Each structure stands twice: as C-alpha cells, then as structure tokens.
C-alpha cells in the first residue's frame, strides 16, 4: 500500500521527469529487451534495435500510461482498467515481464536523476511500479 509519503515522492519524481518520460520509457524498454531477452517474444513485428522508432513509440505509450497512473494514484484500478484488459485478454503478457520492466524503469530513472533518487524515492517508486503491475495483472485470474 502506498503511503501518503510514497505518493508525494512518486508525484515529485514524475514531475521532474517531465518531457523526458517517453525517452526514459523507451530506454527502459531497451534495457528490458537486453537484460531479459524472452521479453522480445511479445514484439516479433518490432525493429528492436537501439533507437528504433517502434521502441520509441512504445516507450512513449509506457510513459503515458505511467503518467496517467501518477495522476490517478489514488484509483489505479479504474485508471488502468483498459490496459489491464488489453494485457490480460489480448496480449497475454506473462506477468513477470512487468517486474522486469519495473526494474529497468528504476535503473533508468536512477541513471538520469541520481541526486533525486534517494533511498526513500527509490522505495516509493518501487512500491508504485509494483502497484501498477498488480493492477495490470489483476484480470489474469
């Protein structure tokens, strides 16, 4: 459960990301594909090379979804219901992949914002990404 301090940390951190969110989303996807090669199986039609337009576009989608989640941090299930349906029923993404992407998002944010990435912010973002992952996999059952 996200505490009020966690929510404040997430909102503050995401606010500093600003216009770089799509770029960071794409970088996190690239890290995920490199570190966890099995994740590539969900993107057989993508050019997965560094800087690919398709990875950039999907990174923007990831960032947009997370921006929406931050804006609706008190009601993640309703805010992410459509995405949960998509990933559970149409795409059938293995739930472990959300953990992989979450880890790579944390690494990416830590690389770009080392001063702001305090242990408290790290913990809050980790809890937030876990909460988002839980919502996205909630309809698998």
Swiss-Prot record:
Listed name of the protein: Hemoglobin subunit alpha
Annotated residues for binding of O2: 58
Role this protein plays: Involved in oxygen transport from the lung to the various peripheral tissues.
UniProt GO cellular component terms: blood microparticle; haptoglobin-hemoglobin complex; hemoglobin complex
Biological process (GO), any one: hydrogen peroxide catabolic process
Family: Belongs to the globin family.
Domain Globin residues, every copy: 1-141
Species of provenance: Panthera pardus orientalis (Amur leopard)
UniProt keyword Metal-binding, yes or no: yes
């Amino acid at each position: 459960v996200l505490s009020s301090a966690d929510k404040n940390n997430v909102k503050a951190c995401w606010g500093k990301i600003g216009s770089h969110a799509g770029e960071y989303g794409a970088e996190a996807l690239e890290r995920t594909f490199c570190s966890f090669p099995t994740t590539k199986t969900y993107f057989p039609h993508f050019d997965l090379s560094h800087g690919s337009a398709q990875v950039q576009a999907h990174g923007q989608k990831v960032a947009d979804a997370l921006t929406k989640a931050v804006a609706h941090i008190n009601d993640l299930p309703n805010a992410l219901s459509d995405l949960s349906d998509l990933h559970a029923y149409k795409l059938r993404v293995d739930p472990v992949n959300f953990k992989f992407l979450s880890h790579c998002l944390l690494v990416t944010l830590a690389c770009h914002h080392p001063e702001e990435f305090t242990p408290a912010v790290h913990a809050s973002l980790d809890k937030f990404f876990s909460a988002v992952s839980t919502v996205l996999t909630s309809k698998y059952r």
